[in-house]
Curated annotation (Swiss-Prot):
The chain crosses the membrane at residues 65-85, 106-126, 131-151, 163-183, 194-214, 227-247, 286-306, 316-336, 361-381, 394-414, 419-439, 450-470, 487-507, 558-578. Residues 246-321 are annotated as: Disordered. Keywords: Membrane, Transmembrane, Transmembrane helix. Residues 251-298 have a biased composition (Low complexity). Residues 299-321 have a biased composition (Basic and acidic residues). One of its GO terms (molecular function) is nucleic acid binding. This is Uncharacterized protein YHL050C. The lineage of its organism: Eukaryota, Fungi, Dikarya, Ascomycota, Saccharomycotina. The keyword 4Fe-4S does not apply. GO terms for cellular component: cytoplasm; membrane. It is a multi-pass membrane protein. It comes from Saccharomyces cerevisiae (strain ATCC 204508 / S288c) (Baker's yeast). It is found in: Membrane.
Length: 697
């Protein structure tokens, strides 16, 4: 099987089909120079959980759902993704596999992350489950050649069914004759990939060997494991026994001629029960065994064999009777806790402050507050140490309650972010000064915030109606609908192809000159930072930016100073997983379109450089004012996650072709500081005069 790129195996249940791929996957995972990512697909959702637990139980494999891969991309940690047939047939999955090499290079900056095995269980379902065949159509779009090996398993599929099932998902089918692997390697088919190979069938049901199932009965002089049977010379495992004048302490017992250690006991004439055994003058109970002159000290005591137990009893320190310490709050604290629990009843769930305000789940999805944590808050605001982490009170005055998943402090962080959504930089700075009495009291701030609950809800609905309409794809931005844009910018008269060409030209110039990306898009400063372009992972990338002082300049020059000192830096590590996944997926679709047109694929920026660009544009006040003036369908957004989400919507260019908004942003940014685009300069006086206008004026 090692020389066969595609195999189908038919074997009865219990024969060991799982180990057929489990052991090779462990071997792949143990390779240090290359990281392999494999995929297993089962027919039904009910099989997922048990399958993941079984394969990940030994700790040799990191196992995760395929949904994580589809939504977020490869995380660089998981060895095996497990999903169902619907995942295998989904467009997002096939697109990610098609663009695997490009995505890996952009994400991990290395080619040492490869696709390993594709395993499909219960292969016969592709042919026999006629009512689901329409759902399997997308599997034919999968690039099987990208995988190192494909394994198809079934317990019931004869060769005819297996052959039809393989052809239904786009493969050649079963081999019609025995294959000489040496001849196969010499053939021209070898260059066409796995999908052109006929699949070799291993029918283990025809084998005459028998596999014993279950447990065997016990005989004289046998060892009984997890069963209840004893003989004259038998050894009972997982039980404890005592005999005349013997002492049983937890799991060990002694007899006249034998010694039982840890979990084994031997007796001359013993009777085995579920947990304990007693002899001639003994009594069997569920946990303790006693004899005629013995005492079983299950509570960490030793018994005296000659009956004088009191003088020889040993009392360890842990046996001193002590009432467990319990914090006893005052009646005022208990009353406060009850009031807060009534006011915020859903903190036992994964609740956020938008849910508390009354927004629907579909609205929360786009008004998301991911990346809002302690680092979002300025220094000194809800960041005190040495106090309760949940409510920032002294421990004896803590008002948190058992089972609380969302702490009051976390809700206060999110409430502060909601207030930021509604205020520009100057207004937010004043707001932070107004709430100074609550800087060390998130619970008090939540009470203050909840008083304006309805007012805040209405404000968000008014101010972000345009944002929800665009991000929920209910409205599409068209540059031709922006009168000011058509009159004031050449970019708004470009075709979609021209905008894309300009976007790739900008990135090509940045790459050649090794320009620091974030600083360039922040203020058009073309400082060099070669370490940034040579960085192999996110950590090295951030260290390169920190070394040249990018984050310090950003905090001193822009509104980034209104957040914690680590806030921008952490955007490159643990936040924006969904956006990263969407961006990587767009690379795959872009690559596929270029290959279909016969065009040489363009070099696209990797994720960290792309995120640097969007962060630089977000904090570039001059650019933001110009874009909002020219593009009349959008208004201000004051949270970085909202800006990133907005930048990834599609807009209609002058020729009605779709381009991502971030490409249009880069073109406008280039127009502000370049002679490459005619009429590139913009009237700053006019911009400042109209920067305070309302959308729609």
């Amino acid at each position: 099987m090692a020389d066969t790129p595609s195999v189908a195996v038919q074997a009865p249940p219990g024969y060991g089909k799982t180990e057929l791929f489990h052991l090779p996957l462990i071997a792949l995972a143990s390779k240090g120079d290359v990281e392999y990512v494999s995929f297993l697909f089962v027919p039904y959702t009910v099989l997922l959980a048990n399958c993941m637990i079984r394969l990940g139980r030994c700790g040799c494999l990191n196992v995760a759902p395929v949904r994580n891969f589809i939504e977020e991309g490869c995380d660089g940690v998981t060895d095996l993704y497990v999903g169902i047939y619907d995942d295998l047939a989904s467009t997002n999955f096939t697109d990610r596999i098609a663009a695997w090499e490009n995505i890996v290079e952009c994400t991990f900056r290395t080619n040492n992350v490869k696709l390993g095995y594709l395993i499909v269980d219960e292969l016969h379902n592709f042919e026999t489950e006629v009512y689901r065949q329409s759902q399997f159509g997308g599997i034919t779009n999968l690039d099987f050649d990208a995988f190192e090996k494909a394994i198809f398993l079934s317990g019931t599929a004869p060769e005819a069914v297996a052959d039809a099932a393989l052809q239904r998902i786009g493969l050649t089918g079963l081999a019609k004759k025995s294959m000489d692997i040496n001849e196969l390697k010499r053939s021209e088919d070898l260059s066409r990939g796995l999908s052109s190979y006929p699949t070799r069938m291993f029918n283990l049901i025809k084998e005459k060997s028998k596999v014993p199932l279950g447990t065997n009965a016990t005989t004289t002089a046998s060892t009984n494991v997890r069963t209840s049977a004893t003989t004259t010379a038998s050894i009972n495992v997982r039980t404890s026994a005592t005999t005349t004048a013997s002492i049983n302490v937890r799991t060990s017992a002694t007899t006249t001629e034998s010694t039982n250690s840890n979990t084994n006991a031997t007796t001359t004439e013993s009777t085995n029960s579920s947990t304990n055994a007693t002899t001639t003058a003994s009594t069997n109970s569920s946990t303790n065994a006693t004899t005629t002159e013995s005492t079983n000290a299950s509570a960490k005591e030793d018994a005296n064999k000659d009956g004088n137990a009191e003088d020889n009893r040993f009392h360890p320190v842990t046996d001193i009777n002590k009432e467990p310490y319990k914090r006893k709050g005052s009646q005022m604290v208990l009353l406060e806790r009850k009031k807060l629990k009534a006011q915020f009843p859903n903190t036992s769930e994964n609740m956020n402050v938008l849910q508390f305000l009354g927004f629907r789940s579909d609205e929360i999805k786009h008004l998301f507050l991911y990346g809002i944590d302690i680092y979002f808050c300025p220094e000194g605001v809800f960041t005190q140490y040495g106090l309760c982490k949940g409510c920032q009170k002294m421990f004896e005055l803590c008002v948190c309650w058992a089972g609380q998943k969302v702490s009051y402090r976390r809700m206060a962080w999110e409430a502060l972010a909601v207030e930021r959504m509604l205020r520009n930089d100057e207004e937010y700075k004043e707001y932070l000064e107004d709430i100074e009495p609550y800087h060390g009291d998130p619970v008090g701030y939540l009470k203050f915030f909840s008083v304006k609950r309805r007012e805040i809800y209405s404000q968000i609905q008014r101010n972000y109606a345009w944002y929800l309409a665009i991000t929920r794809r209910r409205e599409t931005i068209s540059v031709l609908d922006s009168t000011r844009g058509k009159q004031g910018s050449q970019v708004f008269r470009m075709s979609g192809r021209q905008i894309k060409e300009l976007y790739y030209k900008v990135w090509s110039n940045l790459r050649e000159s090794k320009t620091e990306v974030l600083q360039y898009f922040l203020n058009w400063d073309e400082k060099k930072c070669q370490e940034e372009w040579e960085a192999k992972d996110d950590t090295v990338f951030v260290e390169a930016l920190e070394k040249v002082g990018v984050f310090q300049r950003l905090r001193s020059m822009t509104s980034a100073g209104l957040q914690g000192p680590q806030y921008v830096k952490l955007q490159f590590s643990r936040h924006h997983r969904q956006l990263r996944s969407r961006y990587e997926l767009s690379l795959g679709m872009h690559l596929r379109d270029q290959l279909a047109l016969g065009v040489t694929p363009s070099k696209v920026p990797h994720w960290t450089a792309f995120l640097s660009m969007l962060i630089g544009l977000f904090y570039n006040k001059t650019f933001r004012q110009k874009l909002e003036y020219l593009l009349e369908q959008i208004s201000e957004v004051w949270l970085l996650p909202h800006w990133l989400d907005l930048a990834n919507v599609e807009v209609l260019a002058a020729d009605n072709t779709r381009v991502p908004l971030y490409m249009l942003m880069v073109a406008v940014h280039k127009e502000l500081d370049s002679d490459d685009v005619p009429d590139g300069r913009f009237d700053i006086i006019l911009l400042c005069r109209d920067s305070s206008r309302e959308v729609g004026e």
